[in-house]
Amino acid sequence: MLRIIIIFLCSVVIGNGANCQPTPYVILVSFDGFRHDYVEQVNAPNFKAIMKQGAHADGLIPCFPSKTFPNHYSIVTGLYPGHHGLVDNTFYDPNRKELYEMKNRKRTTDPYYFGGTPLWKLARQNGLKSASFFWVGSELSQPDLRPDYYFPYDESISDSIRIAQVVQWLKLPESERPHFITLYFSSPDNEGHNFGPSSNETKRAILRSDSLLGILVNNIRQIPLPVNLIVVSDHGMEELREVPETYIFLNEILNRSDATIKVANGGTQCHLYIEDPTRIDSIYSSVKMKAKNYSVYKREEFPKRWHYDTPRAGDLLITANPGYYIVDRERTKWLSQIEPGSAFGAHGYDPAITKNMRGIFYAIGPNIKAGKKVKAFENIHIYPLIASILGLTTPAIDGNPKVLESILVR
C-alpha cells in the first residue's frame, strides 16, 4: 500500500507539470473521532506512508468544545464556534427560544444557525464547483449555501459507496467537475465511544480507516488530475469507566423541576440558560458550592482561548473534568448494555487541558511538500490552507494562512 501512495503522489505531480497548470483539486476527508496517537497503536501503512511522502502534524487541536458539529464546521469556515454559531452539538438559541440538536434535521438544514463562508460557498463565489459526501452545514435548505453536489446525511450508506461517488465526481467533464470535495466517515468515533479508545474494537476500526484511506488513494491515482488529499478528524477521545464515580448528576446540583432554567447537556459540558438574569449569581453560587469533578463558569468568566462569548453558550456553563461525565439522573449509563467497570469514550473536554482531545492532520499531493512535519495546530487554520491551494481569497476569518504555509509547494 505504501507503493500505491507513492505512485499517487508522482502521478499527480506529473499532471501538474510546468507546461500545464490547471486549478488543483482538494479532497478533505474526516475520520470522526480519530485521536492523534491512534496511528501509533496499530500497523497503519497508508497513514504512515503519507507521513513520509506528504505532510503531517503532531496533532490537530479542536476548538472548544471538542465536539463533532462545532469542529467540522470550524474546519470549513476557519472560524471558532463562538463566531460561526454552532457552539455545541446541542444548545439553546435565546433569540428563537428553541433547542438546536444535531439529530434534528429541521435545525441542521436551517441557514439561521450557520454563519461564516464555508469553503464550498467560497468556491462558488470564485467560479469553482464543489461536492460533499456528508459534512456539517452542507445540506442547508437554501440551495446557494450548499455545495453543487451533496448528499443528506445517512449513516447507513456504506463507506465504499462514499468513496466510489468521490471518484465519480472526479471523472465528470471538466465543466461539471468539483474542485473541492468533502468526505466523511463516522469511524472510529462510534467504536471509541462504545468501547473506549484503547479497546480492540477501536483498534480494528483504526485499521479499517487505514484501509479506506488506501482504497481512496488507489482510486485517485488512476485519475490524471492534480489532486491534493487532506485527512483530518474533528476531535480525539478520552477513556472513561462505567462506575458511579464517573458521573456528575445534574439532579444533585440543580433543581431540575425549575422550568425557568433551560438545560442543554452535552455530557462533557452542560449549558444553563437562566430566564431571569437576576438569578444568575445565586444559581452560579449554588452550583459552584457543590462542585466536585467539574467547574462552573459565568459567561464573562469563560477562558479567552475558547472565543465563546456568545448568547448561544449558556449563561452558566458546567464543564466536567477529563474522565467524568454529566448525566441528568442517577444510574444513567453510557449504554444500557455496558458492563460495570468497563470502558467507554467521551470527548468535548477543553483541548487545552487534555491532549487526548487532539485529532489528526495529514496531507499529500502536488501542492504539498513531502516529508514535512509540523507541530500541533488549531483546526481553524485548515481553511486558509485549502483556499491557498485553490487560489481563493479568504474573507475575514480566525484562521491564519501563515500557520501552514511551510507545507506548501511554492
Label every model-predicted segment:
Residues L2-I14:
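Sec-dependent N-terminal signal peptides
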Residues V39-H84:
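Short, structured active-site-proximal loop/turn typified by the sulfatase FGly-forming signature C/S-X-P-X-R
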Residues D159, I163-K171, P188-L229, I386:
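A long, amphipathic alpha-helix that forms part
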